[in-house]
Amino acid sequence: MKVYAVGGAIRDTLMGLPVNDVDYVVVGSSVEEMVAQGFRPVGKDFPVFLHPETQAEYALARTERKTGKGYKGFHFYADPTVSLEEDLERRDLTINAMAQEVGPDGKWIGPIIDPYNGQEDLAAKVFRHVSDAFAEDPLRLLRIARFAARFPEFSVADETLFALKAIVQSGELSALSAERIWQELARGLVAHKPMHMFQVLLNTGAANTILPSTLSALLVEESFREGLIKSLEIAGNSLDERCAIVLMDLPASEIRSWADTIRMPIEVRDFSEIFSDLRVLINQYPDGSYQAADVLAWFNRADLWRKPDRVQMLLNLAQKLGLPVSALILAMRKAQSLNTADIIAGVEAQDRSNGERIGGAFESARLAAITAAINLDL
């Protein structure tokens, strides 16, 4: 029985990057032996165990065979006779198919085991798939796209690009779960260069399947891509902000439809939708001479009265992008400064239990405050 650290931990160590998680593979052991040594089985589809002390995950070396559609359509075979090289062969990229033995004290020992020339591709900064089985797993396309965003200095090998296109042409992308699509896209969005992820989706033909149709069409235009790169660089690495920037040229209805399809978290979806509505409002009044009723409608849509921090984030993002929102910021502050007690006191005593009358009084007061702010800004 031998234990090896494998995959991303080896890659990141060789690149001089911090290692947060380590995947361990056990060669020459069985389920019975692992349990006897105190490991707790947790894997549903293949033998994975938690270390009795560190709780780190250890997987038995395994091979796989395609039996159905999608990234779950595989039959795994784990046995003491499966070698480390056979286990590494099923991995996606050569740079992720390296290993190093782990000694009894937990320290990595001996040379890097690199049967598929991962170190060579790492030095050349190339994403190259390990074997022909690569094209059997559609999730790998999204992983490569995400890796491209994380490691923008890398290029995709020609033969790997061909394999990625084969995944798209096979129709296997339709078998991916909505949750996994969002998970990979979200990780790519907050990576170093998100545009590289979208470029992979474009180059492979996957954009039309994975992304909203309007966004896919826009990404074909070089001017849009250049503008998107600049906007993403201006914004921080907040997922909410980056997602909103990518989707800001789409109508809110299309954002909602796509977000629901890929199970985007509600708070991220709402932020993107409301920012899209803000863009519409700004474009409607390019000279900044807003109509108070339209501004109030957006404040209500953004739920300023219960979520002021979110509205502040939206306006701050617009300001960072150079959009004319000074009047809106002033209007927000004026509307927020209204005294609730004074508004209620202005309602006839007999109507103060009438929710509709109270609501109308607040709308009128807010509208007046916004009007004053807009006139002050002009």
Language-model segments: residues:
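Catalytic cores of the polymerase beta-like nucleotidyltransferase superfamily
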Residues: M1-L378
